């Protein structure tokens, strides 16, 4: 998705405050609206719906509802989380992935990683623990994005270029790649680097701001090897 498509999608999306409600009472006597999904055994039940629908329902039936607990984790949210069930990748618990994210075959998304709308993860790429892919950040195939790394997102302003990480790139832990930067194929970004300009292919960059320190050699390749065993499903 380009920035304008994302902006249109967010702008047109119905903003919802989704809740889960566990309740008990004289539920056999209650009429549930069609806008609320209900699992009810007459004395106790569970509701799922938008707070805009659930709140007036609870207030209208307070004489028949003895008690309830509301669970909620967002307010006026426009973008749901991605449905992960049929994605051909390994996605660990605790990863936060918004709808409209693309994940390639045999990619690995570790716990705590955050992928915003429009982000792309190529086949066989690992996004390590706590890494953040901002809106429209694009990562190619067979890359490793280290723990705690941030690939800056660009949705607003829509004319700005996104971060692009080409194939077979390795980025160390806690690096930052700023908006509009392209990291060339086979490059290595050292841990803690702050990348503010494009990185040539097959080079190693390090520092703040990141600078080229050498060309990729056999020693570097051995230290940054991508292991297919970690990507098996």
From Swiss-Prot:
Signal peptide: none annotated. GO terms for biological process: diaminopimelate biosynthetic process; lysine biosynthetic process via diaminopimelate. It comes from Enterococcus faecalis (strain ATCC 700802 / V583). The keyword Lyase does not apply. It holds the Pfam family DapH_N. GO terms for molecular function: tetrahydrodipicolinate N-acetyltransferase activity. Belongs to the transferase hexapeptide repeat family. DapH subfamily. Keywords: Acyltransferase, Amino-acid biosynthesis, Diaminopimelate biosynthesis, Lysine biosynthesis, Repeat, Transferase. Pathway: Amino-acid biosynthesis; L-lysine biosynthesis via DAP pathway; LL-2,6-diaminopimelate from (S)-tetrahydrodipicolinate (acetylase route): step 1/3. PROSITE patterns: HEXAPEP_TRANSFERASES. This is 2,3,4,5-tetrahydropyridine-2,6-dicarboxylate N-acetyltransferase. It catalyses: (S)-2,3,4,5-tetrahydrodipicolinate + acetyl-CoA + H2O = L-2-acetamido-6-oxoheptanedioate + CoA. Its EC number is 2.3.1.89. The keyword Iron does not apply. SUPFAM superfamilies: Trimeric LpxA-like enzymes. Catalyzes the transfer of an acetyl group from acetyl-CoA to tetrahydrodipicolinate.
